[in-house]
Amino acid sequence: MKRDDLIFDIIEKEHQRQLKGIELIASENFVSDQVMQAMGSCLTNKYAEGYPGKRYYGGCEVVDQSEQIAIDRLKEIFGAEWANVQPHSGAQANAAVFLAVLNPGDKFMGLNLAHGGHLSHGSLVNTSGIIYTPCEYNLNQETGRVDYDQMEEVALREKPKMIIGGGSAYSREWDYKRMREIADKVGAILMIDMAHPAGLIAAGLLENPVKYAHIVTSTTHKTLRGPRGGVIMMGKDFPNPWGKKTPKGEIKMMSQLLDSAVFPGVQGGPLEHVIAAKAVAFGEILQPEYKEYAKQVQKNAAILAQALIDRGFTIVSGGTDNHSMLVDLRSKYPDLTGKVAEKALVSADITVNKNMVPFDSRSAFQTSGIRLGTPAITTRGAKEDLMIEIAEMIETVLSNVENEEVIAQVRARVNETMKKYPLFAD
């Protein structure tokens, strides 16, 4: 068979882009060679609808083993009693939880998207906001942190069936205990989407929501440094509170509802090559080296945030507890949009994403902020000194967004600097 040079040349171009640049998108990371090998394995050939030991296809004895290893390792990492590793993405995991917990039109509550929430937590352009009825809680305008008193007020007023914690652009620790107390007051299911900080939670650097939430979802890339995918967990399984029964008249456990919501509810056959890669990544997380990596991610984020603050940038909430930060450009560059900032930085081979900030007057296509994160650059071996240098380069670019000569100089500096850093530093 003739090699498809058109596609493989594109793949090599992307490889070079990743090698030469500084990756600061908070949701991105670089996987190890063995995770990559598992994703590119012959397991992609196997259809395996169902779950280990209960498949709708023959010949699943081998993939049953790799999927069960993924389940067992994930449960060990987070202290969960039950886990499902089949969701193709974090959004798919969330959609499955919605299907298991809510009926069409049911009310639920999540963090305002413009304040750092996620599309799958109730955006009106997402199925979560189309099929179900969202209400939202916000950040405190003064502190830039989740306003738990306001969250409780909204919950008591709206009586949501489910409350969601977690977001895509929130740099602070969550008070899961308080959230569970609020959920219990209104009889709501508490779902925590820990997609962003999951790796720091796995390393014991942040509070573990599995101890407090009814249901926890996550992606498997980002700080977990695995393949792109999703998972669902419960600290303790429990009988579903709505009295849904099996054909034999027994009350279904919540795990049964969640398993059915993943398959056949929102997905068909699982991606067993990706699940094997998840298992490999989970095995890496269980090694002592991973905790050191996670500590460095957290250190690098704190140093980068402070270096930017020292240069006059505003960080929403004043800093970070995790791997990420949201930079509000309005104080330092009132006329600069996140869109223009992103384009200028990408031209300098510093990859970031534009992001709305709390109480933003600009649209999601323009924005007044950029989001930064340190998981990927830390995987490459970066330490605190490079964070200081990155802050300097960001300021240089954003002070010269229309000066192609300055941007070219920064790009050359970035490319030269990154020659010292492999994509995955052992």
From Swiss-Prot:
Its EC number is 2.1.2.1. SUPFAM superfamilies: PLP-dependent transferases. GO terms for cellular component: cytoplasm; cytosol. It catalyses: (6R)-5,10-methylene-5,6,7,8-tetrahydrofolate + glycine + H2O = (6S)-5,6,7,8-tetrahydrofolate + L-serine. It is found in: Cytoplasm. It is an enzyme of class 2 (transferase). One of its GO terms (biological process) is glycine biosynthetic process from serine. Its main location: cytoplasm. The keyword Transferase applies. GO terms for molecular function: glycine hydroxymethyltransferase activity; pyridoxal phosphate binding. The record marks 221 as: Plays an important role in substrate specificity. Its cofactor is pyridoxal 5'-phosphate. (6S)-5,6,7,8-tetrahydrofolate binds at residues 113, 117-119, 363-365. The keyword Transferase applies. The modification N6-(pyridoxal phosphate)lysine is found at residue 222. Keywords: Amino-acid biosynthesis, Cytoplasm, One-carbon metabolism, Pyridoxal phosphate, Transferase. Pathway: One-carbon metabolism; tetrahydrofolate interconversion; Amino-acid biosynthesis; glycine biosynthesis; glycine from L-serine: step 1/1. Homodimer. Belongs to the SHMT family. Catalyzes the reversible interconversion of serine and glycine with tetrahydrofolate (THF) serving as the one-carbon carrier. This reaction serves as the major source of one-carbon groups required for the biosynthesis of purines, thymidylate, methionine, and other important biomolecules. Also exhibits THF-independent aldolase activity toward beta-hydroxyamino acids, producing glycine and aldehydes, via a retro-aldol mechanism. This is Serine hydroxymethyltransferase. It comes from Bacteroides thetaiotaomicron (strain ATCC 29148 / DSM 2079 / JCM 5827 / CCUG 10774 / NCTC 10582 / VPI-5482 / E50). The gene is glyA.
